[in-house]
């Protein structure tokens, strides 16, 4: 059985792509106050079809499916079957509970929905991580230094001789026994990317914040890919690009991918 981090690294090399397309299917993104779940389904499949050969991974944010209740969960099941197994699919769930609850979340995300990896919050410690890393073929990306403005309120708090995000990075290295642990590090904090990479050798980074949030693509690629792989997540800027056509979505994705390749001479 291949460890998740090996599989991710091999797929990045095979596709020459560090692109992760975020599937944050916001009804307002289609420009109508009357958007239905069927409208969003159709657009989601359009995004997937337009970028499938360009992306190493897709990252559905579960909140945009959960808002529709049982119909949203059915849509998520259908979408996972539609995507198939030729790309990596990361469930952006940000789970963070412990014990039996964490086990149920892991079963739901890995066994039922069949995600290849998920995002997790480390706030409750290793008890909230352990159930998700038992299967080395499944990966986790742990929130370390996120891209949102208020991240500094907690993640930049002093801990010992560093900051909380430093401590999280060091813990993630310890937790990476099965080579299936990665970190979420936002593109809006390029200095922190470099700092965290100096600690977390070999751990993959999932880097959100490019596009609508104004993150630094160049530094994300340069620093994130030192001694490890960086997966660059782009959501709204691709999914709701231009006139929302397949051509517009694909051209935007190709442009981002071209920029990434140029930055690291891939």
Residue ranges of predicted features:
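C-terminal helical cap(s) of enzyme catalytic domains, especially alpha/beta-barrels
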Residues: 218-229, 236, 240-266
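Conserved anion-binding
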Residues: 26-27, 93, 97-184, 202
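Acidic (Asp/Glu)-rich catalytic clusters
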Residues: 12-14, 48-54, 77-85, 131-136, ...
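Conserved, mostly hydrophobic/aromatic
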Residues: 21, 58, 92, 118, ...
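Active-site-adjacent beta->alpha loops and helix N-cap segments on the catalytic face
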Residues: 67-82, 98-102, 122-137, 187-198, ...
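Conserved N-terminal beta1-alpha1 strand-loop-helix module at the mouth
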Residues: 1-88, 160, 247-261, 265
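Short, acidic/polar
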Residues: 35-51, 100-109, 128, 165, ...
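A C-terminal functional module that forms or caps the active site or interfaces directly
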Residues: 187-233, 237
């Amino acid at each position: 059985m291949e460890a998740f981090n090996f599989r991710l690294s091999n797929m990045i090399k095979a596709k020459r792509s560090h692109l992760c397309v975020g599937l944050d299917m916001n009804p307002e993104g289609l420009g109508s106050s009357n958007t239905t779940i069927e409208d969003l389904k159709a657009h989601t499949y359009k995004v997937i079809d337009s970028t499938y050969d360009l992306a190493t991974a897709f990252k559905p944010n579960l909140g945009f499916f959960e808002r529709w209740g049982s119909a949203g969960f059915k849509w998520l099941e259908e979408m996972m079957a539609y995507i198939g197994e030729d790309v990596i699919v990361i469930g952006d769930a940000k789970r963070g509970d412990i014990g039996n609850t964490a086990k149920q979340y892991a079963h739901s995300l890995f066994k039922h929905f069949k995600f290849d990896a998920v995002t997790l919050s480390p706030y409750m410690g290793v008890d909230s991580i352990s159930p998700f890393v038992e299967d080395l073929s499944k990966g986790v990306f742990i929130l370390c230094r996120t891209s949102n403005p208020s991240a500094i309120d907690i993640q930049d708090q002093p801990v010992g001789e560093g900051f909380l995000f430093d401590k999280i990075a060091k813990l993630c290295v310890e937790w990476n026994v099965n080579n299936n642990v990665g970190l979420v590090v936002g593109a809006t904090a390029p200095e922190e990317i470099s700092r965290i990479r100096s600690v977390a050798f070999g751990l993959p980074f999932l880097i959100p914040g490019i596009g609508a949030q104004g993150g630094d693509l160049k530094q994300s690629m340069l620093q994130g890919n030192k001694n490890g792989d960086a997966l660059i997540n782009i959501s709204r800027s691709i999914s709701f690009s231009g006139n929302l056509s397949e051509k517009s979505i694909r051209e935007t994705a190709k442009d981002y991918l071209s920029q990434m390749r140029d930055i690291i001479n891939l």
